[in-house]
Structure formats: C-alpha cells, structure tokens
A protein has these predicted regions:
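A short helix->beta-strand "capping" segment at the edge of beta-propeller domains
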Residues: 30-47
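Surface loop/turn motifs at the tips and blade-to-blade linkers of beta-strand repeat domains
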Residues: 42-47, 87-91, 128-132, 171-175, ...
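Repeated scaffold domains used in trafficking and secretory/extracellular systems
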Residues: 48-53, 93-99, 134-140, 177-183, ...
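N-terminal secretory signal peptides and thylakoid transit peptides that target proteins
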Residues: 1-14
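Residue-level signature of beta-propeller blades and closely related beta-rich strand-turn architectures
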Residues: 67, 111, 153, 196, ...
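Short, conserved, GDST-rich strand-edge loop motifs in beta-rich repeat architectures
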Residues: 450-456, 497-512
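Blade-level signature of beta-propeller repeat domains, shared across WD40, Kelch, NHL, RCC1
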Residues: 618-649
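Beta-strand-rich domains and repeat architectures in extracellular enzymes and scaffolds
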Residues: 42-71, 94-96
Length: 649
C-alpha cells in the first residue's frame, strides 16, 4: 500500500506543476491605489485533471475527464507507460459513463447528455445520440452489442443500437425516483440500480417488463449506486450503510449482504465481479475490498488513496485497475501488490477546471475544485495544490487557520500556511453531504457550517465547531424542509439564508427561501420569515452597521433588513441571479457571475464596476472573495482568477 502522504503529495505536485508558469500576482499585490474596477489576471484559477470513468480496449486504458473544457478521453498505453493521445469530447461538463462494444468506446456526458463513439482503430470521435435527461450516470453494453444508459431527472433507462443508430426509451424503472446510477446488461435483462430510494430492477430487453430484485430486508436503503455482474451473480453497492448486495441472477432470493468493515464506511462506489471474487471500493475511507463468492470471505486489500472516490474497477490481463481522480491504482492478485499510476505524470491533460469556491486570507487565494484547491501565493505568484479527497465548497480564515467545507461527507477540514496537507476535523453525518457556507462568531468562538442533505433526503443541518473545546455538534432540521445556504454570525446569533431545495432529486415542498436567526448559546431557532417573494435561495448574507443585515436572493435582488423590527426596509434589483455579497462600511459589493456591482448603502443605488466576467463556475453558482484589506476582490473571468481593485468605501 502506498502511504497516504506520498499519494497526496504526488497528486498535488503533479497538478500544480501545470500552473507554475503563470506568475502575474507578484506585481498585483504591491500596486497602490488602483482605480476601482481595475482587473489583474492571475492565471488559471484551478488546474486539474479529474477522471470520471475508464475502459480498456486491448492494452490501452481510455480514461474520461470531468470539468475540463473541452473534456477529453486520454489513451493510456500500458506498453508505453504513457498517454499517447487525447480525444476531445466537445459537449457536456463531464464524463461519468463509459463502455465498449468491440473496439469502439462509448462516452456519455452530462449537462448536456450526449453519447459519443470513439473508433479506436480509426482514431475518430462521432456524436451518435443525445438525450433530454440531465445526466448520463452509467452505461453498459450487452453481449449482442447494444448500449444501455442510466440517466437522472428522471431516473430512466435508454437503449442505443449501434447497428441502426437509433435509441429506444425503456422508461423509468421505478417511477418517481430521480436516478438510475448503475446498470448492467446480459442476453435477456437490463439491470438498473436506483436512488434515492433503493431499487434493483430487472427489465426484460424484449418485452420491457420490469421486476424488482431488491430483497425486502434491504428495501429501506438509499441507493443501489454501483453494480457488477457475472454470468451467475449481480453485486450492487448500497448507500448509506456501506453494504454490498450479492445475489444469484437465476434465484434472487439467494442473496448475501456484505458489510464493509472500515470505520464509518457509508458508500460502495465501484464494483467488479471477476474470477470468482467481488472487488469493491468504499467511501469515505477509500478502502479496497475483495469478497470471495464461494467461501463468503471478505478481505481488505488496502487503502490505495485515503478517502478517494473510485469511479470504476476494471480487470485487464490478470490485474485489477481502479480509476480515481487523475490516477489509477493497480492490484495484482498473484502477488498482492497495490501500485499507483499517476496519469498526469504520464501525459494526461491537466487544464483549467470549473472552480467551485474562492477565498483570500490576505497573503494567498484558495480556489476550490475537484480533489482539492489551488493556492495562489500573492507575493510570489507561485501556485501549489492542496490535495483533499473531495471538493472544497466554502472556506473561511480565522486567525492563522483556514477552514474548508468539503463535499462529500459534509466534512470540515483545517489548513495552516506552510502545511502540505489539511487536517480533517469532523464529518457531519446526519445524511448531509454538501457544505454551503462558513461563518465565525467571535462571541461564542464557534465556526458555523450549514449543509445540504444527501440526494433524496430531507432537511439540511447546521454544524457548530469549537476550536477551543474541540467539539463538533450538528442540529437538524434548523429551518424545516429547507437547506441553510448562507450564514453570518454576530454576538452569539447566526443569521441564516435558506435554499428551498433539500437533497438533490427531491422535489421542493416549499416555494420561498427564508431568512432566520439561530441562537448559538441556547441552540434554538429564534425566528424565520420570507424576505423576497418567490426567491428560491438567499445566496449570501452580510452584516452592516446599526443592526442592519443585507442579503442577496436568487432573483438578483439585494435587500436591507432591520434586525430590530425584523422587516425588510429596502430592496434593489442588481444582477441577473444571486451570488456573493460583501459589506465594507457604507458600500457593498456583489456578483451574479457576469458582473461585479457596487451598492451605495446610503442612497441604495447600484452600478457595475466590472462587466464581461462570464465566470464558468461549477454548477453555475457564482462566487466572490473579499481580501481582508478591503481593497480587493477576487473573482473568476471565464476560468481565470482575477483581482479586482476596490475603494472599499
């Protein structure tokens, strides 16, 4: 097994190396009194090479990327130990699904959902189909060469016939469920793993008849999110108890539920049945397991990369390959060795990704992305990679410590300048997975982190961390049937802005976002109301002077709220949608991703100080960071980090 530190440092150093050539930040930090709105380009915000899936054809591993523009499939030739070519996939924000038919590799994208064929002999890429559903999550080919796709919103199964170039809609295996997350196909059936409420459905390929295979004893599980198949067995990874379901295809009543043994294991993320064994990977631990079908013995083979997500497990010439972000682990059953192959070091494309968060501690700027954050040193222009197995969604600096809220697991990490790794403080649990904001209350000394629940689950949560006591406490629900999206805190009270969406895929049951107050001493909700009619989200909150709170809504409106009277006193339409908002004295700054606006809080008027950003934020959620000097903002133009000079008054 490769030690965790070596894995993190190797992956981080390799990705960051691609960014060292751009060093414009040095001059930017020392410039004096630049006119407000002056932009300084600091180069790519976050450079990464995250993988989403892979497939073998002969001695070549074809690996697909996520979050690049365009995304690519890189051909890693095992014999040459290098990535010899890339195939551009021009649409979609990522590649989650791949399969092969003969020597052709099929690639499924998401947002938008297109199907591509890579002719590996001719070296040609052809778009062969498109689908109305939001995501293509999973694909598998049948023995007779048809391609089956599982999609989401709604959870649907499609069949693509390469011989005719036509697609057939096989419908929703479990009507009302939003996700088909895993799929396999044999001569007779297509097997679909469903979420957010678990189902395992067999669909007759000829008649379309559907049959539930999931045993009643596990019908209360959340997902069948990964699947492997042999001639005789199916194996499905179930959430959220870290369980593997193994059943006989001919007699589904004969089944076993295998519990992953790593502490806190919740998800089985990839499954392969090969040579009498079920190989599978878990999260959050990143542990790699093997279950023997004949003896029912479970083995822990190692932790190839601590906490990493394994997207796919493949067998090739006697070895087992696991596809992870920018890397592949290789297990040799004959020797028990577990090796690590960094594809970026072997030529896989590293490129600017869609950033997820931005934050400045005054000396450096953190930009969160897949698998960690790029850290831009403002004095030297040097960029380093802080590797974390997850996605930093929100950051906050208190003293000499920067806190990071990490998806998945709704985890809180801490990073101190000069350290090569961030330290895990806690995972939220409580069916939460997506941190939304961070705030610090000086009165109580608490770090406050709101989170969104896992797909299909109700009620977001609010977690409180005390650095002094080392305690981490979670409260759920806080605002009933909503997610807390934004937070600020002062004098022992946290002010909360909500999002009507609970877990993804779960239809909202409320119509309007709320503003609420939560007492950090008594841990009670004090009040809640709806500040902007019809707003889906309160994207950001900021405290002003004299008991005034400001917020930005998904409608692009900024509102002023009197905390004493608990009334909205003024509103102004600023942007096209909600983004970050900061108050500096008698002015505020906010963004909708396209422009940065300055608001005069006395006259309550606004003007754009920067236009044309066209920030390519992951998920379309625009972010903004305020330098502690209050003389600069950090934003994203396209996929580059930019410094914006401001007057701060």
């Amino acid at each position: 097994m490769i030690p965790r530190r070596r894995f993190l440092q190797a992956a981080a150093a390799t990705t960051a190396a691609a960014t060292f050539t751009t060093t414009p930040a040095r001059a930017a930090t020392h410039q004096k009194a630049q006119p407000e709105g002056t932009l300084t380009d600091l180069g790519p915000a976050s450079v990464a090479s995250p993988l989403g899936n892979g497939e073998f054809v002969g001695g070549v591993l074809y690996a697909g990327s996520r979050g690049l523009s365009p995304n690519v499939v890189g051909a890693f030739d095992l014999g040459q130990d290098s990535v010899t070519t890339h195939f551009d996939i021009p649409t979609g924000v990522g590649i989650w699904a791949m399969c092969k038919v003969g020597t052709d590799v099929y690639v499924g994208t998401h947002a938008r959902s297109d199907l591509y064929k890579i002719d590996t002999i001719a070296g040609q890429v052809t778009k062969v189909a498109e689908y109305p559903d939001h995501y293509i999550w999973t694909m598998a080919s049948s023995p007779d060469g048809k391609v089956y796709l599982g999609t989401s919103e709604p959870g649907r199964v499609w069949e693509y016939d390469p011989a005719t170039g036509t697609s057939r809609d096989l419908g929703q295996p479990a009507p009302g469920e939003a996700y088909v997350r895993s799929i396999q196909a044999d001569d007779t059936y297509v097997y679909a793993g469903i979420g957010a409420n678990a189902h395992l459905i067999a669909i007759d390929r000829r008649t379309g008849e559907k049959r539930e295979l999931l045993p009643a004893a596990v019908a209360d599980r959340d997902w069948v999110s990964s699947m492997g198949m042999s001639e005789t067995h199916l194996a499905g990874g179930m959430n959220s108890l870290g369980e593997l379901l193994v059943l006989e295809k001919a007699a589904p009543q004969n089944y076993k539920v295998v519990k992953a043994t790593a502490a806190g294991e919740k998800y089985i993320v990839a499954v392969l049945i090969h040579d009498g064994y079920v190989y599978f990977a878990g999260r959050p631990s990143g542990t790699f397991y093997r279950y023997h079908l004949a003896t029912e013995k479970l083995e822990v083979l190692g932790v190839p990369y601590f906490e990493a997500l394994t997207h796919r497990i493949l067998a090739h010439e006697g070895r087992i390959y696991g596809i992870q972000d920018s890397a592949v682990f290789v297990y040799d059953p004959a020797t028990g060795s577990l090796d690590y192959v960094n594809l970026v070091q072997r030529g896989f494309k590293a490129a600017p990704e869609e950033p997820m968060s931005v934050h400045s501690d005054g000396r450096r700027v953190y930009v969160g992305g897949k698998g960690g954050a790029d850290v831009h040193d403002l004095a030297t222009g040097k960029v380093t990679r802080l590797g974390i197995s997850g996605e930093p969604k929100t950051l906050l600096t208190v003293g000499d410590t920067t806190y990071l809220g990490i998806y998945t697991q709704a985890a809180l990490y801490a990073h101190r300048p000069g350290k090569t790794e961030a330290d895990l403080i806690a995972r939220t649990g409580n069916q939460q997975d997506r941190p939304r904001d961070l705030a610090y209350d000086a009165t109580t000394g608490l770090i406050v982190m709101p989170t969104q629940p896992e797909p299909g689950h109700m009620n977001g949560a609010l977690s409180l961390y005390s650095p002094r006591k080392g305690t981490y406490e979670t409260y759920r629900p806080v605002v009933e049937r909503q997610t807390v999206y934004s937070v600020v805190a002062r004098h022992g009270v946290a002010y909360l802005g909500t999002l009507i969406q609970e877990g993804l895929g779960l239809p909202p049951v409320t119509t309007t976002a709320r503003l609420a107050a939560f007492d950090l001493r008594t841990r009670k909700l004090l009040w809640q109301l709806e500040p902007i009619p019809g707003a889906r989200m309160i994207s950001s909150l900021a405290l002003g002077r004299n008991g005034t709170l400001y917020g930005m809504a998904s409608t692009g409106e900024v509102f002023e709220f009197d905390l004493r009277s608990r009334k909205v006193t003024r509103t102004i339409k600023v942007g096209t949608k909600g983004g970050e908002l900061f108050v500096t004295g008698r002015v505020a700054y906010c963004t909708d991703g396209g422009s940065i606006y300055k608001i005069d809080l006395v006259a309550f008027t606004s003007k754009a100080i920067v236009d044309g950003l066209a920030g390519q934020w992951f998920g379309g959620e625009p972010k903004l960071a305020l330098d502690p000097s209050r003389r600069a903002l950090y934003a994203v133009r396209a996929r580059n980090l930019v410094r914006v000079a401001i007057a701060g008054r």
